[in-house]
Amino acid sequence: MFPKFKFPFLKKSFKQKVLATTELTTTFSYQERPEYTRIIAGAGWKYHWTNKNNMTRHVLDLVDLNYVYLPKSRSNFLDSISNPLLRYSYEDHFILRAGYVYYHTNKLPSNGYRQRFQSDFYTFRAGVETAGNFLYGMSKLFGQKKRDDGSYRVFDINYSQYIKGEIDYTYTHRFSPRHMVAFHSGFGIGIPYGNSTILPFEKRFYAGGANGVRGWSVRTLGPGAFRGNNSVTNFINQCGDIRLDFNMEYRAKLFWVLELGAFIDAGNIWTIKEYDNQPDGVFKFDKFYKQIALAYGLGLRFDFTYFLIRLDLGMKAHNPAKGEEPWPIFHPNWSRDSAIHFSVGYPF
């Protein structure tokens, strides 16, 4: 990381008004599952800049390249994925993308008396990324022939092409230094096009988990009214192209580092088109509101100033999955309707 812009043509006056860094990154991820082994290697060049009070921040991913490689998979793993669109997410592919993230808050800096008693503050985050356009343009320019499935390849490897956007807004009201309530709403959508017919698995949205609808474990909710019934491929099918989240959380400081949280979560994910392995998962304006999952729960937090440890217990209130009890809030079953989450930091 360089403590200034490594970018030509920028005026000196602009560089003096902002706090900026240039970041060169390399990443390596190794994932071992019973069904497959996956390796993701990447490199990127990005810029960060913020105003002097750190209330507005920008991140520009100028270029980010990831290579997803599956050296081995269980013999029946890909065979169990009958939908060829989902199979694509578990084959070797490139992701060459660019993106931009904007972040703004009116929350005052933490050093000072005013911050401790600021009654209302908000944060807003919006991001967009796109992938595959440069490679697709080069394929067209040099007259590369498409494969039988209608896609281009680079070094005989597929590359993804899509656009994806996300917006999140959080508002917090303090009743006193020890009591507050926080509201969060979020929306995201990803659309494949050109060289892709589906988003790569690592770019699709998922629901449930410590930062989602906490009545469900991660990747066990949605899309839509879809109900998973195959333990081998559930984690593949329970992801989507659209996400919608609403959360409300009351937070109270008890004593020492201990805090209490009470929350209500709502949301789900959907696909933008019909997939054979995700029935009832597509987003429809006349149905999506009926497929919004609801959860409630309590949590304990340990605030050590520099980091916070969180333990939440969530319970299902409304389950949109077909064939399940639709309103478990009236007939709760602990083993069926509860989920425990351990995480670091607030959910929003």
Segments predicted by a language model, with ranges:
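Conserved C-terminal beta-signal and adjacent last beta-strands/turns
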Residues: 244-252, 260, 266, 293-304, ...
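Short Gly/Pro-enriched loop/turn and capping motifs at secondary-structure junctions
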Residues: 255, 267-271, 305-307, 316-320
